[in-house]
């Protein structure tokens, strides 16, 4: 019952996890996809996040947290999706840094994101 309640509270995080799986992030091989592939999967899943509008934001992490009310888990999944896309490397690094600063500041240690920052 508790799992059901948590999933209901984090529908966006669950949706992002499904998208990550479809993009190949949950497999043992390194995924290879473009930002266009991510947008297509968002559209198929009817994800409420407008990726173009999000990436135009000065601070996409703040936007996700404050406007979309994304959970820590959802943010972690979203950043992982973006990190493995063909988004500009400097932009990915900046977004990853902002996400780590936000999550670490809350006491949510993300092994996945810290591993990405060290690669």
PLM feature spans:
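Charge-patterned, phosphorylation-rich low-complexity C-terminal interaction regions
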Residues: 75-78
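Amphipathic alpha-helical binding modules
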Residues: 81-119
């Amino acid at each position: 019952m508790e799992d059901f309640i948590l999933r209901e509270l984090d529908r966006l995080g669950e949706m992002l996890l499904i998208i990550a799986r479809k993009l190949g992030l949950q497999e043992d091989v390194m995924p290879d996809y473009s930002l266009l592939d991510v947008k297509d999967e968002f559209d198929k899943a009817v994800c409420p996040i407008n990726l173009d509008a999000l990436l135009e934001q000065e601070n996409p992490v703040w936007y996700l947290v404050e406007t979309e009310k994304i959970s820590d888990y959802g943010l972690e999944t979203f950043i992982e999706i973006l990190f493995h896309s063909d988004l500009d490397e400097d932009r990915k690094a900046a977004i990853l840094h902002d996400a780590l600063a936000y999550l670490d500041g809350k006491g949510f240690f993300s092994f996945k994101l810290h591993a990405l920052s060290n690669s």
